[in-house]
Amino acid sequence: MTEGDLAARLAATSFRYPLRRYQQAAVDAFEQARREGRARFYAVLPPGGGKTAVGLEVARRLGRRTLVLCPNTAVQAQWLRQWQDFTPHTVAAGADPDLTTPITVLTYQALCVLNGDDTLDEEALDLWIATLQAEKGYSAEQARAEIQALEASGSPHYRADLARFRRRARTLVARGGDRSDLLALLHPNGRAIIARMAASGPWTLVLDECHHLLEMWGYLVRALVEELGDVFVVGLTATPPSDMDAREAALYRDIFARANIEVPIPALVREGDLAPYQELVYLTTPLPHEADYIAAQHARFQELLLRLMELDFGSVPFPVWLRTRVEERRGRDGAQVSWERFERDEPRLAQAALRLLHSWGAPPPDGARFSERDRQPLTADDWVALIEDYCLRCLRPSADPRDVAAWEEIRRALPSLGYILTRRGVRAHVSPVDRVLTLSASKAAAAVSILDVESAALGDQLRALVLCDYERAGSDLLARLRGVLDPQAGSAALLLHILASDPTTAALHPVLLTGRTVACSRATAVDLTQWIKEQVPELRDQMTTEQLFLPGNDESDTRWEDVVVIRPASTWWQPRRYVPLLTRYFEEGRSRCLVGTRSLLGEGWDARRVNVLVDLTAAATPTAVHQMRGRSLRLDPDLPDKVADNWDVVCVAPGHPKGTADYDRFVRKHHHYFAATVEGEIESGVSHVHPELSPYGPPDPAHFAAINTAMLRRAEERAAAHARWNIGEPYEGRETHTVRVRFGRTPGLSRSRLLTPGARPGAGAVGRFRRRLGQVLAGSAAAGIIVAAAGPDLAGLAAGIVATAGGGAWLVRDLHEVVRQLGPSDALEDIAAAVAEGLRDTGGIAPELGAESVRVVAQADGYYRCYLAGASEADSRRFTEALDEVLAPLASPRYIIPRYIADPPGSMLDTALLALRLRRTGRRGRAVVYHAVPSYLAANRQRADRFARAWNRYVSTGEPIYWKDPQASAIIATQRGADPFDVTTQMRVLWR
């Protein structure tokens, strides 16, 4: 077929379904890029958002031969199926590496597999020698001798280490930029594909799930694009990679430039194109024998901590060193630096020091304050930050024998916590405690409980997907934890066995589906094999089953007798065929629970009926999280009111410094993932799961049962979850930073109480008072005089009330309201209004924003959420950070500003006298506290003065005072660390 014939046939082809609004927007963005002469198109669409249709439509419009690269065979099959929705069927699509069809769909592995020969062994050995020199201080001869001895011994570690340094050598070649050297690393099959493409262009190259292209695959794809020359690159992903280093970001930009369109998940849920969902968690603690092991590990670490606190440990004891570091804070030049600078230069050390001081009940250092993050127990990472600083800055430079001995003692103790001390610092190692938490048997038990409740709630409609990291555990994975964990702990195979053994979950007929195995119970196998014979006649005489036997289980282990593998004796039985087949079996409801690995079913796999996801993986990157969650978000045509329940199972070991490792992963999973809260707000972070969950540490284990009960109850209340999404309602489509405020209960003069929203009278109080005063005075000789005096003049109000003593309780109450409103304010909305106007007047936020944009919303857990309506992401962030600074204790402000506190009047006479004083002095009171002028507004005197005008208007009389002023220095020293309000704040992000 000629190039012209292909273009004509593709032009005559069309997608049989109308494109959704955002799909059409993506195609329009492509056309705009093409009009601009660009040969790149990059779209970010959520899982289930129809990326495949968009990619094929773009390829159709380009009218060229097309190669689609995707991450696995399940996704490959979906591309081929989707092309069948383009009619008429005059252009063939296939999966032949010989590129025999105009549209070819291959996996990245088919193209990018590397040559397995030893061409880089010399470079790998050089890297190995250099590494031994750096880490162990060897000479080149010593390093070479150790490697040769390892090879001669026949140790498997030699082959493993050589393979590792080969990979590193290949990476260096890839980063070197020589295209021919890089392409020479490819397997001959990959080089043959490139040669065929070069001889038959021009091409459209579609890169599906292109977030994978950060390292070797990315370098190879970039080399392919450069080799072909005339190629249009289409990048598609649901999850653009985050946390890229500079090299990865540059590579990604080289391939794709910038995104042409990005559509967030909540937008498609609100539009009704994805299913609403709720994020749920089941919290567990280790089983008794696991807890005993963790306690033993904890004891070792406690011994180290006790030694660190002894005054004869090292020439400079650890507590003395720490006190000196955080109080004197010497920079590299020896000069003392501010806490702000110290925190910026040493963020991990600063956080760890604050947490340690808070745990001791000690005040923060000058210029610091305890935030929500700092009021958490120390984690293992915190201790490591403190210990690393002590080792590198105090012990290592010293030749004192006490310091040498202290270094060795720390070096021997750290591996039990999962760290290794080297000359360059402390680096993470595999932590046995973390592994026990990740693979705890309590998680499988939790999965059974979850599926039990979900089955009761959904009945025959249940379609559950349980994801694990691997199908089966290797023999060495858990070698150090024999007797603590099952040899197959964490594997999909063990989970299948557990589900098949429990009477409740066995009724779901769970099936294990991976890239190499289909397994189930013997009872399920009877139905499954018969069904397969009906669907694939050529397998009718080929069906066989055999017992699933896994490494690490001896012959006496009879648990696996009831678990069998389906393995037809036919070449037809390949993942790209049996995965769609088993998916259909699942969607028909013959099995209501699939167990699989995230590598196959956690990305790209499409099953519309999945409505429960149980995530048992350790993957916590935004990419992995969005991909796995995306499996449950597709609309189900048979269940119009579908709500997906996405479950995490988290194991916490209370008391152990590494005991929050699994919870920390849970926090990372939800860090920038949006979901509906119980309030119906779309929020990122773990608080959208449950308001008691903090990003800085787990709740008290005593609350686990109550939280789990609440989660299981929500699984039964899908209608409420559906309603929280407000499907069909308009949305702004922007992220908004907010601050949540919880009010204390201890008011006082030096520590006043921040008024809850609504506690402060509205603007109509003065007019209401005047009308009622006129009613009381009507008919009296003095009426006209007093009402006239009462006008806007507060003294007239006071005179009026004194003259009409006994005129009514409501009159006294209204006067109290008016006087309080015109006096200094301690109301949240007034302080927020002052911050908003100060930022607006200094150009810190958009000019259309201000006091009228402030919103304060009561929350069910006792917090109030404050934010700026209509603000951009950047403006909302600046506002919430500034408001948080004003509400917080003084740390090291550049400017401070007073807020007066008025005594509440106790009688009618007190009210009158207060009114007279306010008329004379303005918004002052008998006591005063000071607040920090927010950093942005304290950048210079002009900004501080403009903030002061807004502060005077809404909060209190007072002028900003520069920190070097003697008065300010004395105030800061006196008030530092004291909370001007008894409040707790939390910073959160909403999607609106």
Q: Residue spans of the language-model regions?
A:
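Conserved pre-motif I regulatory segment
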Residues: T2-Y42
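Conserved C-terminal RecA-like helicase domain
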Residues: P46-G49, A92, P97, P102-I103, ...
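Conserved Walker A/P-loop ATP-binding site and its immediately adjacent core
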Residues: P47, T52-T87, T107-V113, W217, ...
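Conserved helix-turn-beta segment of the N-terminal RecA-like "Helicase ATP-binding" lobe
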Residues: A74-D98, L114-W128, R253-F256
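Post-DEXD/H (motif II) to motif III coupling segment of the RecA-like Helicase ATP-binding lobe
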Residues: H212-L274
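Long, largely alpha-helical accessory region at the distal end of helicase-like NTP-driven motors
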Residues: L305-L354, A661-D910, R917-R924
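A short beta-strand element within the Helicase C-terminal
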Residues: V595, W605-A618, Q627, A644-D648
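Conserved segment of the helicase C-terminal RecA-like domain
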Residues: Q627, R631-Y663
